[in-house]
Amino acid sequence: MYKELKRFEQILFDACSLLLLVFYTWSAVITPAATQYHRGIYIIVTYILVFLLYRSKSSWFRMIDYLLIIASLTSLGYWLLNFEVINYRVGAETELDTVMAIIGVLISIELARRVVGNVFVVIGIIMLAYGVYGYMMPDAIAHAGSSFPELCVSIFYKSDGIFGIMANVLATYILLFVLFGAFLEKSGAQKFFIDLSMASVGHKVGGPGKVAVIASGLFGSISGSAIANVVSTGTFTIPMMKKAGFKPHQAGGIEPAASIGGMFMPPIMGAGGFLMAELTGQSYSWIMAVSLFPALMYFFSVFMMVHYEARKLNIVGERSAHSGWTVLKAGWYYITPLVLITLLMLYGYSPAYSAVIGLVGCIVISWLRPGTRIGPKRFLEAAREGAENSLKIGATVGVIGIIIGVLTYSGLVLTLADIVISLAEGSLFLTIVLIALVSLIMGMGVPVTAAYLITAVVAVPALTHLGVNELAAHMIVYWLSQDSNITPPVCIAAFAGANIAKADMWKTAFSAFKFAKFLYLGPLLFGYVPEFSLDGSTFDIIKVFIYIAIGTWLYSYILSGIWLQTWFGKREGKKA
């Protein structure tokens, strides 16, 4: 997409990418920016980049893109430059304040339409209509309603709207970690992760499938997107699995099942972990600690499912030319940026500061090999790719602000929580099932991070009302928000895997659904077993971890169906 831009547009895109990198690095390491600049610069630059990159098809309509860029600069810049004045006159906004708010809200809808799609936008428009015509709704969800201009003012200027929690998390954490991921990839780390996985388990039973699980765990924890992980690691692992003897739909299903585990795996956990820290008030290091064992159990489950599937098909991979230890000795330094980030956060440094130090570490290690050195040209490429990768989630900020703003403005948050509790009749199990259905439906048109935030606003109060601790409640919602990646009929990541595997989309989707079954067990454990989220005595936590590890193995063994084959059939397949 970048290559299709005109030369002056490319220069503008590069300049904006460097501005994001420099400004937020300075803010994280040297001097924190004031709230309005911290959030405002991010949103303004993101809007400019989106209208540059996701452009209109005809040259005539391209002029509209430029007008939208100017309108974005005007409206968002007005908020930025008049932040303190507007805060002083809350409730007494001027006509100009109102006009700028309306422009900002409408532009946010168009921005999301270009990047995310129509379904997400329709949800935002429905929420706007609900905010205006709430008095016409059924009694259970009715509210007084508001005029459209008044609602836009609330959404645009209040702290729970467009410039609210999502904007803060994206500007404070996500952007720098997405940039870190781009620099880590430029340094050659992705190849090292795959080589290490290949050398360690590639020659074992189901070796290529296990390589996909381990490589996706290593790279997925920093890629920030299950789909990006499938597309990047899957281009290597899926053909390798097919060659070894896995059926195309199995190879295409294993990769997305493994890839979504990266969203749970510390140190980065996609965007959700940072949102969780912001919403719960817990330190991110504690979020990482709570997430580690459940994430390991998820990968253990997928790993064992792959193992038993390979045993059924008698698939054994080829031995690598080098041992895992040899590969690790040759490229151990690729792990240092991740170790640096983890240690810094555990020692109390902010995630943003840690990400910057990790990014510098990526540049340093890149110079250890001539082919991966990050000089000025590759530095600009990494900054550009990082900025571009951030747009998928960044483009949601406006419509999420609309949805959260209307939910808060109307009081619908508490109403929906009461409805969920009422429908579940006080049953925790049914409440979790309802949340799973809501997150799946939400995921049909909303990115998973947005689905998590929107669902959490409604579902967490319902779960805590039933006795689940707040962090465990957020974990339940966050895990279930990933289900749209692999659960039919949506399963976006599974469809990406099917495309690479050249397999039937629905067979691949159900294969991914099968391999990722722990995704549905995890939320139940968070709900019913407090120790799973480190809530209990040390002895009880250790005891429960042992039980869960054994149970996860048994769970995978039973779901794989290999015990049926052991009793009634013989293995068939081939050796790679």
Functional labels for PLM-detected ranges:
Residues 1-116:
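Polar/charged low-complexity regulatory segments
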Residues 110, 114-115, 123-140, 148-191, ...:
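Core transmembrane alpha-helical segments of multi-pass membrane transporters/permeases
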Residues 180-183, 218-219, 260-265, 403, ...:
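Hydrophobic transmembrane alpha-helices
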Residues 14-18, 37-51, 64-73, 98-107, ...:
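Hydrophobic mid-bilayer segments of alpha-helices in multi-pass membrane transport proteins
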Residues 95-99, 160-173, 199-213, 244-250, ...:
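Membrane-interfacial loop-to-helix junctions in multi-pass transporters
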Residues 35-46, 89-101, 170-171, 290-298, ...:
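Structural signature of hydrophobic alpha-helical transmembrane segments
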Residues 2-11, 17, 289-389, 492-576:
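Long, contiguous bundles of hydrophobic transmembrane helices that form the permeation core
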Residues 194-262, 268, 281, 448-480, ...:
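Hydrophobic transmembrane alpha-helices that form the pore/transport pathway of multi-pass ion
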